[in-house]
Amino acid sequence: MRHRMKRHKLGRYGSHRRSLLRNLSREIVEHGSIVTTTAKAKALKTFMDKLVSKAIEAATTEDRARSVHLRRQINAVLGDRRLTNKLVDEIAKNYVGRRGGYVRVLRIGFRRGDAAEMSLVQLVEASSQEG
């Protein structure tokens, strides 16, 4: 049975959707924030939260084999060792005490050409994790 299997399909077939999310996640790791449609932003938020959680575990675990395994899983998604190292060594260090909510989606209005709702997707700053 397929109970509770809801996911953001984005009007694309599976491999295209995975490719889209991988590309968007690469951009957010590289630049820190991106502007995209709200539907893509919501799908990207859950995708990136899982990726950052893996990065935090890879950065904090004492088990070397587990850390290498997690880095390889992250690299399989990002496809670039430089971005993998940036995510694990720089970005994940800011979120060690945090239990989720690493990505923020802010609605910024509508696109001029087709009136699609646009959103700003950004990594939450480390200073705002207090509280």
From Swiss-Prot:
Q: An example Gene Ontology cellular component term from the record?
A: cytosolic large ribosomal subunit
GO BP, sorted A to Z: translation
> Where is the signal peptide, in residue numbers?
none
**UniProt entry keywords in alphabetical sequence:** Ribonucleoprotein, Ribosomal protein
Q: Which GO terms describe its molecular function?
A: structural constituent of ribosome
On assembly, the entry states:
Part of the 50S ribosomal subunit. Contacts protein L32.
Q: Which family does it belong to?
A: Belongs to the bacterial ribosomal protein bL17 family.
HAMAP family under this entry?
A: Ribosomal_bL17
Q: Any idea what this protein is called?
A: Large ribosomal subunit protein bL17
Q: Write down the species.
A: Thermotoga neapolitana (strain ATCC 49049 / DSM 4359 / NBRC 107923 / NS-E)
